[in-house]
Amino acid sequence: MRKIVAGKLHGLTVTGADLNYHGSITLDPEHCEEAGILPLEFVEIWNRNSGARISTYVILGERGSRCCVLNGAAARTCQPGDEVIICNSVYVPEGEIVALRPRVLTFDKDNRVTSRLTYEVTRDSQGAYHFAVRDERGDEKPIPLRVEAS
C-alpha cells in the first residue's frame, strides 16, 4: 500500500488560533466537502510562512464561514494571517493510483476558492507513470504549476 494525496486545500489563510482547546483544525464544511476531506480525518498542515509541518484531525466549523482555526497544541504552529496548505491522504495499492482524482482548491486571502484543480496519474503501455494537473474545464496545466500570489 502507498500513501497518496487524496485532496488538498492550498493557500488557506488562518483565521484563528485557539490554544485552550482539545486539539484539531476547524474548517468550513464547504471547503472540506469539495476537496473530499471528512470530519475527524487526519490531515497534514504545512505553514507557508514558518515552514512548520504538523498533523491533526478535522472538525467542521460553520458552513460558509471560510474559517481555518488551529486548536490546542496546533495553535502554537500557525497564527492568524499565516497561509497554509492542508492535505489529506489515502492508502491504495500502487496499481490503483490511476483511479484517483484528488481535488485541489486554491484560495485568495479571504479564503474564497480561486481555482479548482484535479491531479491525474496515468500509465502508458510501457508501464511508465505520467502526472497531470487539470483545471475545471479539463485543460492540462503546466508542471510545476506556479501558485498565483493572492
From Swiss-Prot:
Top-level taxon in the UniProt lineage: Bacteria
Recorded metabolic or biological pathway in which this protein acts: Cofactor biosynthesis; (R)-pantothenate biosynthesis; beta-alanine from L-aspartate: step 1/1
Active-site residues, as the UniProt record annotates them: S24 (schiff-base intermediate with substrate), Y57 (proton donor)
Cellular localization per UniProt: Cytoplasm
UniProt keyword list: Autocatalytic cleavage, Cytoplasm, Decarboxylase, Lyase, Pantothenate biosynthesis, Pyruvate, Schiff base, Zymogen
Protein EC: 4.1.1.11
Cofactor note text: Binds 1 pyruvoyl group covalently per subunit.
A Pfam family matched in the record: Asp_decarbox
Record-listed substrate binding positions: T56, G72, A73, A74
Root EC class: lyase
Modified residue annotations for Pyruvic acid (Ser): S24
A GO term, aspect molecular function: aspartate 1-decarboxylase activity
UniProt xrefs under SUPFAM superfamilies: ADC-like
Main location as per UniProt: cytoplasm
Cofactor(s) this protein cannot do without: pyruvate
Self-association state and partner proteins as the record states: Heterooctamer of four alpha and four beta subunits.
Record PANTHER family: ASPARTATE 1-DECARBOXYLASE (PTHR21012:SF0)
Functional description taken from the UniProt entry: Catalyzes the pyruvoyl-dependent decarboxylation of aspartate to produce beta-alanine.
Family indicated by similarity: Belongs to the PanD family.
Identification of the protein by name: Aspartate 1-decarboxylase
Organism listed in the record: Xanthobacter autotrophicus (strain ATCC BAA-1158 / Py2)
Taxon lineage: Bacteria, Pseudomonadati, Pseudomonadota, Alphaproteobacteria, Hyphomicrobiales
The gene coding this protein: panD
